[in-house]
Amino acid sequence: RAVKLLGGLKFLVVQDLFYTKTAEMADVILPGSAGWCETEGTVTSSERRVQRVRAAVPLPDGVLDDMEIVFRLARQFGHEWGKPDAETIWNELRQLSPMHAGMSYKRLEELGGIQWPCYDEAHPGEMYLHSRLWQEPLIGPRAPFHAVEFESPVDELNEQFPIRLTTGRYLDSYNTGAQSERFPSPLRRAATIDLSPEDGERYQVGEGEKVRVSSRRGSVVAPVRFDSGLRPGLAFLSVHFHEQVATNDLTIDAVDPKSGTSEFKATAIRIEKYLDN
C-alpha cells in the first residue's frame, strides 16, 4: 500500500543518510548527515536519558546538516529563520515541551545527561516514571486499573487460512536492512517461513523445501525452516528481505482502534507445496 501511495505522488523528495527503498522512488534525494558523528544536538536513549551529541568529523562534500536542509527549505517557502544553531533549536523545544524544560545544554554537559521528565533547572530528572505513585502518603489520585475484554484479530482463522502468521526481526538485522545489510554477520541467514516441526509433518513439507504462503491479500514463496520454539498453528516471517520474500504483501492494514498500531502480528495464512517451474 505504501509503495502504491508513494508511486502516485507527482513529486517525491526524500532526505536520508542511506539509499533506501523509499529513496529509490524519489525525484530528488537530499543526503542528510550522520547524527552519531557528523552533527550537533542531543540523543535520547531508551531509558529516557537525554545527552549531548557533538560532531566528531566534518560533513562530506555535497552533504548538508539536517538543520541546514530544513532552514533552506523554509527559506524557499518565504520564511527566514536565520542561521541554524543546535542549541537555539533545543531551547525552542524546551519551551514547547514541559518535560524537557529543565534540560539546558549547560546542565546536560555538567550532569552527563538527564532523564525526562525534568520540569525546571532545579529538577534532577526522574529515574523512573510516575514516581508519585510510590510516595507515602500518596499525592494525587491512584493509578486507574481496569480489565479489558479480549478482541480477536481482524484477520480470522478458518479452514482456508488455518495458520496464524506473525512477523518480526532477526537478531542481526534491522527493518528493511538499509543500515544493517551493509556489514556481514555470522548470524545472517536468508528469509524463511518458520514453522513448528509438528506443522511440517501436518503439511508434509521438509526443511529447506519451498512453499507458497498465501493470505487473503497476496502470496509469497519461501523455504521452510523448522523452529521448535513455535507452537503448532503459528508461523513466522521476517520483514528484512523484501527482494527475497515480500512479507508485507501478506499482512493486513487493520489497526488497533485505541493505539492505532498496525496489526502486522496476526495474519491468517495457509501454506502449500510449491513446484518451481
Task: Give the role of each language-model region.
Residues 1-24:
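Glycine-rich phosphate-binding loop of nucleotide-binding enzymes
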Residues 1-6, 28-29, 156, 180-184, ...:
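Short, solvent-exposed amphipathic alpha-helical segments in soluble enzyme
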Residues 10-12, 28-29, 162-164, 192, ...:
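Beta-sheet entry/capping signal
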Residues 88-183:
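Long, low-complexity segments enriched in small/aliphatic residues
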Residues 8-11, 28-35, 59, 75-80, ...:
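Short, well-ordered loop/turn and helix-capping segments at boundaries between secondary-structure elements
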Residues 51, 159, 214-218:
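Short strand-coil-strand connectors
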Residues 18-54:
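Flexible glycine/proline-rich, aromatic-decorated loop/lid segments
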Residues 56-120, 176, 181-194, 198-277:
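Long, contiguous, secondary-structure-rich segments that constitute the structural scaffold
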